[in-house]
C-alpha cells in the first residue's frame, strides 16, 4: 500500500493475474470486457449517488474510491500508461481559464473552467494499449 494508486492497482492485477488474462483477449472479448467495466463503473456511480442521497459519509468515500479503482484498473488492464494519460489531461486542463459556461449552471459560485479560444484537447496518441485491437 502506498500513495501511488496506479502502482498499487497494477500490483493487485499482477497478484490476481488479471492483466495476463486480458492481454490474451481477441477484439470481441476485449469489447465485452470494456462493456463489463463500463457497467461496473455505472453500478459504482449509482451506489455513490444513493449514498449522497442518504447522507452516508462512509459509503460516499467508499464509492468515490471504488470509482477510481475501477477506472484506473481498466486503464491498467488495457496496458495504457495511466501516468502519461494523466499528465496529458492535466496539462490541457491547466490551459483552461476561469470563466462562466452559460449552459452549465453554477449555483455554488465555484471557479468554473472554460476552454479558451485555441484550446486543444489532449491527445492520447501512442498510448492506447490494447484498445488498438478494436476496429472503428
Task: Map each language-model feature to its residues.
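Flexible "arm" and connector segments at domain edges
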Residues: 1-64, 68-136
Amino acid at each position: 500500500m502506498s500513495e501511488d494508486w496506479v502502482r498499487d492497482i497494477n500490483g493487485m492485477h499482477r497478484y490476481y493475474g488479471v492483466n495476463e488474462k486480458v492481454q490474451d483477449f481477441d477484439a470481441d472479448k476485449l469489447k465485452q470486457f470494456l462493456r463489463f467495466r463500463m457497467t461496473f463503473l455505472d453500478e459504482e456511480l449509482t451506489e455513490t449517488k444513493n449514498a449522497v442521497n442518504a447522507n452516508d459519509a462512509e459509503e460516499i468515500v467508499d464509492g468515490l474510491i471504488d470509482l477510481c479503482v475501477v477506472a484506473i484498473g481498466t486503464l491498467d488492464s488495457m496496458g495504457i500508461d495511466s501516468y502519461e494519460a494523466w499528465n496529458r489531461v492535466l496539462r490541457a486542463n491547466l490551459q483552461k481559464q476561469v470563466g462562466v459556461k452559460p449552459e452549465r449552471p453554477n449555483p455554488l459560485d465555484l471557479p468554473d473552467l472554460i476552454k479558451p479560444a485555441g484550446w486543444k484537447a489532449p491527445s492520447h496518441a501512442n498510448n492506447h494499449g490494447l484498445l488498438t485491437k478494436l476496429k472503428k
